[in-house]
Amino acid sequence: MSHSDTVALRGLIFFAYHGYYAEERKIGNRYGVDIYVRTNLQQAGTHDRLKDTINYETLYAVAKEEMEKPAQLLEHLGERIVQQIFNKFASAARVKVVIRKYNPPIGGICHAAEIVLRRKRNE
């Protein structure tokens, strides 16, 4: 089975309470999330049925739910999102999640700090 097709959500924006420092988790910050799911979309393309694809409304709900739960590290937050996607979509073969924290507290000017996770099912 080919997994060269992708369903993606790009540019999701959340205000959330993540960070290593307690103050970050108290005052919050703006975050961006991109999600890419590799799957086979042939059945969805042929039969025009939502059940044959990765429902991007559900992808958004996964991201929103996980963004609402505070985490110290973006890496931990990203892993939670990836695992929820694999749990909800049996057809998801690979997942890429990008999370960016805008204006991170690093002692200088920085538009965003970003992590990129790429995971294959059963890795």
Predicted regions and their residues:
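N-terminal, polar/charged subdomain of small-to-medium soluble alpha/beta proteins
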Residues: 1-123
